[in-house]
Amino acid sequence: MDFMKLAREKAKLVEMDDRLVNRAINEGFSGGEKKRNEIFQMAVLEPSLAILDETDSGLDIDALRLVAEGVNRQRSAERSIIVVTHYQRLLDYIVPDFVHVLAGGRIVASGGADLAEKLEAQGYAWLERGGIGKLDVEIRA
């Protein structure tokens, strides 16, 4: 399969206008289009490990769903996806296999999706080390 055909096929994954594949990376893209472009690039490159850092930042609810659907469609036994987020809302659409809480550059708590739900409900104060950390989510099929 030639590259342009592959790119157009993968653009459909995140409902990206296939004419955008002819633009330079992120040239003239809105914030939501840039995030969808990240997922599009992941689909084209098919990495065995992908790290998505705050991929939900600045997304409206429709764009969030599109990005999450794009991530979910790429879940496989051959790929690990690490999603870094501060908010539970992304995890309403991407159910994590593991959740790790980072604070001060260290993992201070680990668990399943219920850990993220507890953080959303109770905040970070209950953690032994306290402080605000990033919610680091690992997804494995």
What is the role of each PLM region?
Residues E54-T55:
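Walker B catalytic motif
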